[in-house]
């Protein structure tokens, strides 16, 4: 347990440092989604998917975990592309259903176009990012920021949701300890929902 705590602490410490690097990371991913090299396009599109939805990487799991669908193991049947949106629907970790719709506007339009290209001529049971694994994703992330991995990135995305919630509810600093705890739980719930973890609404 102690080793896991140390690993988690290191992950959180790295995630905290990402706040100042996030624009650099996003800009590089967006640029590479238009690269002429198809492998770079595939890797950066998988990385954008994780950035955009906080989805797990897919083929990276603890020994006691069952195989689950994630970014690199996503199949054509898990994604529905309309003219203006991307709809995800699949069972993720702990058999929790992951449903999310991303509108194809701004950078998400390039994301939509890349996915459209990737699913072309594929069967429903085919993986969208064929040939791309967590190793490729993590190598790509760490080429932008040293030590950055998909797990660290998801930790950053979750912690930024918590920080945003607490900033928006700044008045709770004057609240009693029970109210503070309740809001802390709500903030964590929002982060858990973004990461598609199983969580229940805290009791008051």
Q: Which residues are covered by each model-predicted region?
A:
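Extended accessory and catalytic-adjacent subdomains in large enzymes
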Residues: 2-204
């Amino acid at each position: 347990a102690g080793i896991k705590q140390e690993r988690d602490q290191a992950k959180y410490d790295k995630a905290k440092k990402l706040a100042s690097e996030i624009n650099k990371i996003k800009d590089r991913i967006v640029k590479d989604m238009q690269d002429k090299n198809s492998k770079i396009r595939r890797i950066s599109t998988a990385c954008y998917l994780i950035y955009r939805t906080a989805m797990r990487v897919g083929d990276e799991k603890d020994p006691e975990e069952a195989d689950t669908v994630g970014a690199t193991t996503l199949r054509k049947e898990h994604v529905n592309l309309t003219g203006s949106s991307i709809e995800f629907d699949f069972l993720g970790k702990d058999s929790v259903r992951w449903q999310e719709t991303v509108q194809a506007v701004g950078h998400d339009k390039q994301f939509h176009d890349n996915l459209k290209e990737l699913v072309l001529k594929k069967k429903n049971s085919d993986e969208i990012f064929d040939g791309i694994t967590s190793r490729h994703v993590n190598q790509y992330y760490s080429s932008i920021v040293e030590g950055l991995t998909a797990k660290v990135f998801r930790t950053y995305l979750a912690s930024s949701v918590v920080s945003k919630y607490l900033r928006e509810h700044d008045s709770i600093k004057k609240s009693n300890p029970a109210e503070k705890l309740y809001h802390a739980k709500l903030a964590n719930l929002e982060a858990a929902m973004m990461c598609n973890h199983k969580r229940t609404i805290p009791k008051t």
